[in-house]
């Protein structure tokens, strides 16, 4: 009898920490999704509202730099907006995982969708980074001149908007690993 009661106590002790760890992973997943959504929203807003007009202009020509002059920066804004929307929608699934720690199929779906969104945000950040690099340094081989000496505020804002996007890339990698750990524990 004592042996049976000890075994039953051990089983209940093993089951309780598993649920606690799964719940902790789910709460961490929820928090990281909120942070990533704020980062991508901030990046999209910072880039999407960036423009600068030079103080000197002729009667017919205004020297103006806007993000939508460059397709790579438009892609950056759109991709960050899509990823932010996905992150906000995925918060519902994350709350479901907090309430119920055992759903494996929805975690597998999140891993797949998180991987797609990781690819999208990485591609957009890389494309925007190349444009920001050329804006700062130019390319003498192609006769592209650096514009950041003239459009200082524009360059600071587009450079700063990359930070949130790269934070989202790092958070997506962590989110995918957390989901895979949660799947392997079930």
From Swiss-Prot:
Keywords on record: Cell membrane, Cell wall biogenesis/degradation, Glycoprotein, Membrane, Transmembrane, Transmembrane helix
Transmembrane segments: 27-47, 73-93, 108-128, 163-183
Extracellular domain ranges by topology: 48-72, 129-162
Keyword Iron: no
Subcellular location: Cell membrane
Membrane topology: Multi-pass membrane protein
GO CC, alphabetical: plasma membrane
Glycosylation sites per record: 51
Main localization, broad class: membrane
UniProt topological domain (Cytoplasmic) ranges: 1-26, 94-107, 184-186
Example GO BP: cell-cell junction assembly
InterPro entries: CASP/CASPL (IPR006459), CASP_dom (IPR006702), CASPL (IPR044173)
Family label: Belongs to the Casparian strip membrane proteins (CASP) family.
Subunit comment: Homodimer and heterodimers.
Role according to the record: Regulates membrane-cell wall junctions and localized cell wall deposition. Required for establishment of the Casparian strip membrane domain (CSD) and the subsequent formation of Casparian strips, a cell wall modification of the root endodermis that determines an apoplastic barrier between the intraorganismal apoplasm and the extraorganismal apoplasm and prevents lateral diffusion.
Protein's name according to its UniProt entry: CASP-like protein 7
Organism of origin: Glycine max (Soybean)
